[in-house]
Amino acid sequence: MILADYEAVYQLWRSTPGMGLNNVDDSRAGLERFLKRNPTSCFVAEEEGTIVGTILCGHDGRRGYLYHAAVAQNYQGRGIGTALLDAALSALEQEGITKVALVALKRNSEGNGFW
């Protein structure tokens, strides 16, 4: 993921039922900070040039954290979420991170079904 993906990623987040967003962390500046700190562990999935999935992943040097995994509704069930998760976990492993925490909101029933 790169900062230029922000608008498409943000629209995907907004269209995802149960996604918890806030004005600071999920702003363009917030994502820029996150990507600078975690340049190799955040991913998008594209279909014909359109972003259809995303995952934010970072770590504090000890434990990895997964945030904002989303796949456009008409692309769900095709393995995109699993591929994004595998990419994020692989990126953490390459940095020596072997523990991962997940942020999942109770109200996100679709997302919780995936996890």
What are these regions (language model features)?
Residues 73, 102-112:
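Conserved beta-strand-loop-alpha-helix junction that forms the acyl-donor binding cleft
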